[in-house]
Every structure is written in C-alpha cells, then in structure tokens.
C-alpha cells in the first residue's frame, strides 16, 4: 500500500470515527436526559464509579497493546517475494499480542472489583441485584477483552468504517437495554408481582439496568466483530484466533509467540501509559483533595462540556494520526517522510487557526452559551470565570494530542522510556503547581486549569523538540517550520478582529451581542479560508482523485 493510499484510508477513517463519536454522544445524551426523570443523583454517582472501574481495567489491559500492534508491518522478517505468507504471519502476530489484554484483564478486573467492592458504601452493597450488577459488569469487561484480537485485526487493515458501525450499534444496544429495564420497572410492564415500589428497589433496578447495558454493549460489539471475521477471514483460514507459535522466516527451526521488538515496545509503552493515566486522572485526585463539593461540581461540569470537542474532534484525529504515522514511517524513505511532514504541518496549521478562533471568541461567548445550555442556576461568577479560563486551555490540549501522537508512533523503546521519565517529572510539577495555585493563591478551579495549562505546555515543548530532532536526523530537505507564512499574515487580521470584538461586544450578555461576535468570527474564518485556499484546493483535488480511484 502506497503512502497516498494509507493517507486516504486514515483520513476517511478519522471521519468515520468522528461520526461514530457524534452518534454515541447524541444517543447517550438523549438517554441521560430521559433517565434523569427516574433516577436519584446518588445512582448517577455509583454508576459513574462503576464506569470508572470498567475504564480503568480496559485501559491498563489493552491500551498499550493497541498502540504497540500499530507497529506490526507485513513481513518484517520475510522476503519480498512471499507476500501471502508474509501477510498471514503478520496477522498471527497481531492475534498473539491481542491475547495479552485477556491475560492482564482477568486478574486485574477480579482484584480491582474485589478491592473496590469492600470500599463501596454499605448502602449500595445491600441494594437488590447489586451483586448481580457487579457480576454483569465483570462479564462485560471480559467480553470486551475477548473481542480484542478481532479489533486489532481490523486496526491492522485500517478498517475504520467497520469499527464506527459496530461501536454505534453497540452503543445503541447499551442505551436500549438500559432504558428498557428502567422504563419497564417504572411502568410495571414485567414481573409486577415480584417487584415492589420502594426507593431501594428502584435504585437496585437502576444499577442493574446500567450493568446490563454495559453487558449488552460488550456482547453486541463481540458479535459484530465476529460476524466480520466469519465474512472476511474464516473461509481463507490465514490465521487462528488463539495463541499460536510462529515460525521465523529467517530460521524455520526457531519459533516464537511474540515478536521481540514489539514485545519490548509494549513493555516501555505500558510503563509510560501508567504515568499518562496518572496525569489524565490526576485532576480528579487534586480537586477531590483541595476543593469543596461545589468546586468539584463546577469542574465536573467544565470537564464534561470541554470533553465534547476533545472526544468528537481531537481524539479521532489523534488516533488516526498515530496509526497513519506508524504504518507510513515503518519504512523511512524520502517520499513517506515528506508525506508525513506534510500531514503534520497541515494538522498543525488547522489547530493553530482553530486555536485563534477559540482564544478570541471563546472567553467572551462561553459564559453566555453555558447559561443558555444549562440554565441560570449555574450563573455564579466562579462558574462564568472558570469557563472562560477553560477556553484558553483547549488549544493546549489539542496541540499536545497530535504532538504526543507523533511521538508515540515513531519513538524507539529508549525514547519512549525517556519520555516516561519526563512524564513522571510532569506529574510532580502538576501536583506542586496545583497546590500553589489552589491552596496558596486560592484560585480554586481556575488554579487547577492553569496547572493543566502549564503541564500541557511542558509536554508540548518536549514533543515538538522530539519532532524537530526526528526530521533533522533523517536529513529531510524541508523544514518543519515550512508553509506557516499564511498563518503569520493572518495574525494581523486576527488581532484587529479581537480588538473589535472586545470593543463592540465585550462579554456577551444578549443574543444581539452573540450575533455580532459570531459575525466577526465568520469574517476571521473567511480570511483564514482565503489565505489557505491553495492548500484547501490541493486537499479537495486529492480527495476527489482518491474517490475516483475507489469507484
């Protein structure tokens, strides 16, 4: 597969992932807004806690494998004239590595659930069906890990379309089961003689509905991927869905289960992800330690709304970029290097322009939009000020995502290890900064956001330095700083629009002010599109050519 073909598939894949995320968020939003009429806040709290357990087990079981298997290229130890054998060997390597999450996840899930079960408030433990709910959660985790070999195979073939479809179907199944159980109980549609109307029974049913929804999600996902396997792989029997010894093409007497280079990479990535997870979840630990319950609610609100743009836009782009670079730069020829740099530069420019729009129009419009979305009860000064500061944080989040995605895709084991040590230092810096800003300077939620900005800045500097060094060492003719002249020219127009925005509107408090600010945003967007019209025309032409080729 050529570099252009890989780029076309990953670009289309990013679109599929965004559409899948959008569908999932809409369905989940509708479900939550329906169920909130029937459930108490503490039930949402315990389900969020169970969700955290599921996410933690799955993250530590499979995330490092998903990143490591992206580096499995066809035929690393094969001759060039044995394409079919080479493909089969690579597929079995993928399957073997995808069995590791199950070996990690079974003991990890049992240990974590057993530990947390004893720490859960006794009230929840005595609720009806609670033990069955926990068991259903555990079975759902195991089913997701059983599905991992099929997921990794689709990832190997850049099959984003299937993934987006299957995850959307699974999310729908989750929501339908969850809603059906709660609604059936509330309307007394089933087993009315067995159920009672007590609040405890209602809460037990709600937790059971959540657990059965998770189980339905995992089972549906597994069935979809297995159907894909039956349709596309089983008849050819190129590999087995179990741990198998693989013969080395260099020496047929030698066999292995796991390729040594990928295994070493997995170990170092796993070590790094532990610190990355600490930084990702660290803000929750900090705010629970230093902030009041009201402040925790404010930050939870900001995180939930702020994560929408992260999950809908940034996350699909980062995942597609990781896979693109891992495949594209498995062979560092000049053509692939130039293509990878071009993709990175275009993405960086896109994020720069997006950051301009967010930084100029986010702080003065966000508080008005937030009040419009969730009502006036959140209209305290602390909330309105915090959402403005959070808008400044979003660009740092975006750049860190793509730069660390690049590093994760091309870094050697030793470079990943050094990055892990750097992440450890960032963790300590984050803790110290949070204490200073929250406790000493009394900045509350704003202090936590500022600490996150400093943390992201350090990580961006490290990753960007790695990228510049990477291309310099490979003696590429172009510079990573190329083609940013249009952005520099746009900065002048952006500064003028920003001044007009603050002079004419300031902090938006009415619909007329919002329309004026939106008009200025459209003017700046038009300037950006005009300045970058050559790049946009090139992308459109390439997309049309790819579509004609696929017809």
From Swiss-Prot:
Location in or out of the cell: Endoplasmic reticulum membrane
Biological processes, Gene Ontology terms: dolichol-linked oligosaccharide biosynthetic process; glycolipid translocation; protein N-linked glycosylation
Recorded coiled-coil stretches: none
TM annotation in the entry: 16-36, 40-60, 95-115, 123-143, 168-185, 204-224, 343-363, 391-411, 421-441, 448-468, 489-509, 510-530
Gene Ontology terms, MF aspect: flippase activity
Major location category of this protein: endoplasmic reticulum
Pathway: Protein modification; protein glycosylation
Assigned protein family: Belongs to the RFT1 family.
Protein function: Intramembrane glycolipid transporter that operates in the biosynthetic pathway of dolichol-linked oligosaccharides, the glycan precursors employed in protein asparagine (N)-glycosylation. The sequential addition of sugars to dolichol pyrophosphate produces dolichol-linked oligosaccharides containing fourteen sugars, including two GlcNAcs, nine mannoses and three glucoses. Once assembled, the oligosaccharide is transferred from the lipid to nascent proteins by oligosaccharyltransferases.
Protein name: Man(5)GlcNAc(2)-PP-dolichol translocation protein RFT1
Species the sequence originates in: Candida glabrata (strain ATCC 2001 / BCRC 20586 / JCM 3761 / NBRC 0622 / NRRL Y-65 / CBS 138) (Yeast)
Gene: RFT1
